[in-house]
């Protein structure tokens, strides 16, 4: 009989030594949902608060404190009971609501029930109507700025600022045969305007002295500048006559900015009444207003990395003319609009140089693609519901008797709950959990999808997006992807990959 060793010690005779211990493979799901409960819920309520009526006299503030245990009751049923009863494993959420009447100074406070929010089980899944579901992480293009060769043969280069929410801004350089170079811009993918029109719209400090320095630096734009400046002069003179403006240098610069606003507004909103105020509000609101434009934290981080040095270089070249980026604000700064234009023009000028600091971006590199995990996806659904609720609150403020208004009577939670239910029941990213075996369930929770709202569609996705990229190494498995129309659009996180605070995959 052979005697077996009773020692529990394992010996490893491999030449390579022990493998690195595996991390928690469910952390992509658990960490993201925990962050949503601690931070995302509060941010969503802060984004719509305060809600004011059309006169600005009445306002409603909503405040959620994740550390206040009175605002979060424990779940009614356990996971097992939810499965048996075919109900949703959820937790009641409350908010502190404060109604303020600025005319009388009256304040009414209440704790208001906002609905039952589905919560994640220990296994990283959700129980929705008794069935186990997984929310798949989405792989999307990161907000920020990208410089690429033009898609059209006459466009040499183009640079696009993609915000988290708001209008795109695109600058490009056209080079046609036997014609001088022409730089332009597009706002919200509308008709093209000259780059000089965009710069004039930024600030009244954009005077002839600035443009002379600008053209001296980018001499290949000299012909375009002289043509555009002559045309602009005629427009400015007409504008000053129309509004009876005195012919002074200050008025000339003011008229220069106003005519640029009007030209942009004409392209963006053809058919609408062209007034200076409407044009100003459109341009300022499109990129510099927090209500209509949001770069997001990721976009601000990417812009600081890509354009930070260019903004500093422009201050040296042209002087400190424009307002600089504020790290706290997730809107564009005027200095960054100028930096996007100069980066593109420097890229065109240095294209044949052996050494340059200007480089084309690869949109398929994982530095330019990020993960929207479960917490962020639920937060987006919640924001949609809250913005619908905001409209209801405004209407009720105008129709109800001011004396009898209380926070409870203003708030209708139905739009919020229907947005959350709609996400879990019908979203392309909320799926029945694969329960063939424990391993298929685990890989399902680590799945990455480029499809879904805000992502790609099977029909439009080209070969480059689907292909294996060198930046996938150690981040996403290059082998495991379905056959058929989804090939390359569905992937799986590698063993040692993790998601950083900005949603980028690290290894």
Stretch-by-stretch model annotation:
Residues 108, 447-478:
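Flexible, glycine/threonine-enriched loop-and-boundary segments that flank and lead into catalytic domains
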Residues 1-449, 494-507:
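N-terminal non-catalytic structural scaffold regions of very large proteins
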Residues 126, 479-480:
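Residue-level signal for helical boundary/lining positions with a hydrophobic bias
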């Amino acid at each position: 009989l052979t005697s077996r060793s009773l020692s529990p010690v394992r010996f490893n005779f491999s030449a390579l030594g022990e493998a690195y211990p595996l991390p928690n493979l469910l952390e992509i799901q658990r960490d993201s949902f925990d962050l949503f409960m601690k931070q995302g819920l509060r941010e969503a309520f802060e984004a719509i608060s305060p809600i004011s009526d059309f006169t600005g006299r009445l306002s409603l503030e909503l405040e959620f404190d994740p550390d206040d245990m009175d605002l979060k009751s424990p779940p009614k049923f356990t996971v097992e009971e939810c499965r048996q009863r075919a109900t949703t494993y959820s937790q009641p959420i409350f908010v502190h609501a404060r109604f303020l009447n600025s005319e009388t100074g009256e304040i009414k406070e209440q704790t208001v029930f906002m609905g039952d929010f589905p919560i994640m089980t220990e296994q990283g899944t959700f129980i929705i109507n008794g069935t186990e579901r997984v929310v798949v992480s989405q792989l999307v293009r990161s907000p920020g700025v990208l410089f690429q060769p033009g898609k059209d043969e006459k466009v040499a280069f183009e640079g696009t600022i993609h915000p988290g929410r708001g209008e795109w801004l695109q600058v490009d350089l056209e080079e046609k045969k036997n014609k001088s170079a022409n730089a332009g811009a597009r706002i919200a993918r509308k008709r093209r305007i000259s780059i000089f029109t965009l710069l004039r719209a930024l600030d009244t400090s954009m005077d002839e002295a600035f443009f002379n320095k600008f053209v001296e630096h980018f001499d290949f734009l000299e012909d375009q500048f002289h043509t555009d400046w002559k045309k602009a002069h005629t427009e400015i003179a007409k504008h000053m006559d129309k509004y009876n403006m005195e012919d002074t240098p200050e008025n000339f610069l003011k008229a220069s900015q106003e005519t640029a606003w009007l030209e942009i507004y004409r392209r963006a909103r053809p058919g609408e009444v062209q007034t200076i105020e409407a044009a100003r509000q459109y341009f300022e609101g499109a990129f510099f207003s927090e209500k209509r434009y949001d770069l997001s934290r990721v976009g601000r981080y990417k812009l600081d990395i890509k354009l930070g040095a260019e903004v500093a270089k422009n201050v040296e070249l042209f002087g400190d003319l424009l307002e600089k980026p504020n790290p706290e604000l997730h809107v564009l700064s005027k200095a960054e609009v100028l930096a996007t234009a100069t980066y593109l023009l420097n890229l065109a000028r240095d294209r044949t140089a052996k050494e340059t600091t200007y480089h084309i971006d690869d949109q398929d590199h994982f530095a330019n693609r990020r993960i929207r995990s479960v917490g962020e996806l639920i937060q987006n659904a919640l924001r949609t519901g809250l913005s619908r609720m905001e409209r209801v609150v405004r209407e009720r403020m105008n129709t109800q008797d001011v004396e009898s208004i209380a926070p409870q009577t203003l708030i209708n939670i139905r739009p919020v709950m229907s947005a959350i239910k709609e996400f879990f029941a019908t979203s392309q990213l909320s799926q029945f959990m694969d329960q063939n075996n424990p391993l298929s369930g685990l890989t399902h929770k680590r799945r990455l999808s480029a499809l879904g709202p805000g992502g790609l569609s099977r029909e439009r996705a080209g070969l480059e997006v689907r292909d294996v990229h060198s930046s996938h190494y150690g981040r996403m498995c290059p082998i495991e992807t379905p056959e058929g129309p989804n090939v390359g659009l569905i992937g799986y996180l590698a063993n040692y990959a993790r998601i950083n605070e900005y949603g980028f995959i690290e290894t």
